């Protein structure tokens, strides 16, 4: 075999080896992406396609906009519009937890009236008619007057507590404090529903925005896939480029499914907070207000929270009510003095047994506790211990409020700083994507580099959008922690 023949064989073998390697790479399955949020892998919207040379889509102006601008890029649908303020008002009106808390407060007011009834006189009236054999006697049963007479009469009586040395007064005071505690709990429940509504609203708003981005991502990847496949047919790009474009399109479709499921789930959560028993899909409207930095002084926020938090006020009232009830239990050891009276008329009566046709009497009674197996002393001790426990519960919640306000303030500051950082990151990602597109169009880089730049740009755009929502939610959480009235 001549040297020239050997050179031809080696050249042909090298070309065959390179061709088979390229085909193997193109046919190899794409490496599965690392588990991450779907929003981290969304792709930007494509630009207008050129007539002569296929152009890779430019960075989407939509994904780099604010959440409100992103929502406004889509045509309005027939779904009802809903703002955050409207959602809060609807939730506080229709959510069953708020209704239950208000009803319990109304019920506690009736407990106050029930307790106060012991201080008021009790009156009753009676009408009695008896048909009996005169002078016969009851010989079995309870210990009562044994003689029976035919008679008919009507009368009335009353009882009035004179004093029980403060027991009833302390019971009334305790029930009034419990009513205040229940009203504070109702307000705390309302604030819980408001913050839950804000969380559900922003989650659903974010999910709707990401659903629109994912749909644009599918359109972009479809355009890119069509362009690259056409260039591959014309021998302008390799099979590897076409394979990467197909993989990116499949990933975009999967992300669209995830985004749709996330949007439906968050909307279902919002419907539940709003107190709806059916599915209603709203078109959520952001307030589009400029972002303001959080308050600079956390100590003032702590003092405000300790003064305004309704759940802390409820525990204070509960502790005071427990103290009053403890005093009332101690007062059981004192005597109880009450008055009683009765009067009436007997128009039908046997004259030989009745000296008058009416009766009347009034008197005063004193009950003095002597011994009942240490019941009163044990009840008094139990009430004192429970009052101390209520005081410690109030102190524990106070410490938690101080901690929660400080951590919420730190989270709000961090979220506010992330808005500026993610905006700068988005700016740099847009610049990097533009350079990567230019290099790919000039044939200086592969589609892998372009895809990586597109991923980074989309990740930065979604991160900037998320940062704005997270800061709004962080401010709402901070207002909740300081007890701001919704």
In which residue ranges do the predicted regions lie?
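Transmembrane beta-barrel architecture of outer-membrane proteins
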Residues: 151-153, 199, 244, 359-361, ...
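Bacterial Sec-pathway N-terminal export signals of envelope proteins
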Residues: 26-128, 278, 285-319, 370, ...
